[in-house]
Amino acid sequence: MTPNTEKPILIAGGGIGGCAAALALAQKQIPSIVMEKAEEFVEIGAGIQLGPNVHKMFIKLGIEKAIEEIAFYPKNMFMNDGITGKLITQVDTGEKFRERFGAPYGVIHRGDLLDVLVKACESSNLITMLTSTEVEEFDEIENYVTVSTRDGRSLQGSALIAADGIWSKIRSKIVNDGNPIVSGHVAYRAVLSISEVPEFVK
């Protein structure tokens, strides 16, 4: 299919991936429509690590300053045995780390990261943000794609990007790779305010 550049690119999913894709397209002056099935743009979950590569992406998207204001940049990273508490290894993530990789290592809450992305998308006149818009079906018609939403609407675009998560309906129709496979690994996580963090951890 040859894309129709007169139509916007449709993006199914208004999470971190979908909003980042919309901003990247806007950098190239390509309009897009972000379709989120929820009633608002929210991200559940806990913390997420921000390595040097993603910080370089933030710079390209023009959101690095907003991220730096709310992310936390530790000077050290420790890995301890979950049962004994014994230190396994330690990584210096301070100035030497920044010099070596050209960007810092940080951590941020997934919801805070999405807030920055959503605000950046909403401030762009090239990005249309739609909530309560769940893609049910899509069809390629000549040089454009048509999507049908759960509430009966129809939208047209030059292409369709699937950013609708692990249970993606679009991916299942294109790749047909089956349901996600449980890895068998379990992670215990918690979110605390800085005032609740023990002093020795700080």
Q: What are these model-predicted stretches?
A:
Residues 2-9, 16, 26, 51-195:
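Conserved N-terminal helical subregion
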Residues 9-11, 32:
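Conserved hydrophobic helix-helix packing surfaces used for dimerization/oligomerization
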Residues 15-16, 41:
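Residue-level detector of alpha-helix initiation sites
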Residues 19:
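Residues forming the Rossmann-fold NAD(P)(H) cofactor-binding site
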Residues 26-46:
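Glycine-rich FAD pyrophosphate-binding loop
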